Amino acid sequence: FNPKAVSRISLDPAVVDCIVFWTKNPAPMLPRLRELERYKYYFQFTLNPYGADVENRLPDLSRRIETFKRLSDAIGRDRVIWRYDPILRDHTAKCMLGFIDHYRHIRGALGELGVGPLRRDEIEVMAQSFVRALEPYPIALETCTVKVDLRHLGIPSGMCIDRGLVERIAGYPIAAKKDKNQRQVCNSIESIDVGTYETCLNGCAYCYALKGNYNRAE
């Protein structure tokens, strides 16, 4: 998101190919999914097993897992991408794996948790554990903006705004190139980001989009 490049975005279904929602808790949206029936869309649902010391304002993990399943049952497993438990094996077709970026403004919070930069060998060990965990299940594993090449482990570099998935959901080809405004390791196609910093209430220690200003977000 670039706060210096703000514009008015039309949400007319005639000009919207697809909407991708990033969320850790879409529960409030479930009763209103019918309002989205005019649009083609899918979800990037981040679901981690961390405790309240890391993700301190989220609902209990068991509740979020149930939300994931309900969302998948409502719109289909191909349209709910799990961002980092075989427990979800029947409810998603893909898991996106990412590793923490040590942005300057979150180093203090990460330091308090004893979290430092990851070495290449540590990344590979964790990636291998995901490969083993998902091997028995029909869940594709891809990375998101990971600088370490993990293809030798069978993990390709994926994309959050996925041309193939958007085209399958929309039902027609998409005329979009790789987004040149993202990091070089990002493979996503061009899109328009609707949102802004300092608005999320989840309070995750590793979040780069909120600099601890919860009052502003509230």
Language-model segment annotations:
Residues 58-68, 94, 119-131:
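Well-ordered, non-membrane alpha-helical segments in soluble/globular domains
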Residues 40-50, 79-84, 92-103:
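Non-cysteine beta-strand/loop elements that form the S-adenosyl-L-methionine
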Residues 105-132, 137-140:
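C-terminal scaffold of the Radical SAM
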Residues 14-17, 39-41, 76-80, 92-93, ...:
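Short, well-ordered coil/turn segments that N-cap beta-strands
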Residues 192-212:
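Local cysteine-cluster metal-coordination motifs and their immediate loop/turn environment
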Residues 1-55, 61, 66-70, 214-218:
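Conserved Radical SAM active-site core
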Residues 12, 154-197:
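N-terminal [4Fe-4S]-dependent radical SAM core
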Residues 55, 88-90, 95-118, 145-158:
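Flexible glycine/acidic-rich beta-alpha junction loops that bind and position SAM and/or redox cofactors
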